[in-house]
Each structure stands twice: as structure tokens, then as C-alpha cells.
């Protein structure tokens, strides 16, 4: 398997989605890591309120996928925020029912 060289949050697919979407991300190997890094992936609504945490654990370098089920949430814009060490990135997602 190929080990990612950079931290990356891919755009969710499909987008817009109803009710499920797939979120893929890369956890790189870093010189300062002891083999695993804590990764946090959370979903926020358009007002910036956290609605769920999809990932909050130490992960080995590699590519991962998680699913977000928007069944209980209203249509609208949501943000997927991934943090890894000192880095963070955000993608916009649209739930369209």
C-alpha cells in the first residue's frame, strides 16, 4: 500500500447527498510521529455548531473512508472539519432532501 505524504481531506462523494455520503482522508507518515497520529473528523452545521464526531482516535498512516448519515438532519450546508496534529482543513457539504 502507498503511504500518503501529506494530510488531505477529500471532497465528500456524492455531494449534494441524501442521506449518505462518503468522506475519504489521508493520514501521512510524519517524522515526529511515533507511528500513529490522533485524527479528529467532525461535522458542523451552517451555524458552526458541532453535530457529530465521525473520528477521534489515533490512526496509522494510510487512506481512510467514513460515511456520514444525514437522515436525522435537515437539508442544508454542513462542514466537515478534519484536524491532524497542528493542521486542520474544512470541506463544505450539501445535504439535499
Regions from the language model: what does each represent?
Residues 39, 52-53:
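Contiguous segments within soluble domain cores/interaction surfaces
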Residues 1-13, 17-42, 65-68, 84-87:
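Glycine-centered coil/turn sites that cap beta-strands in beta-rich domains
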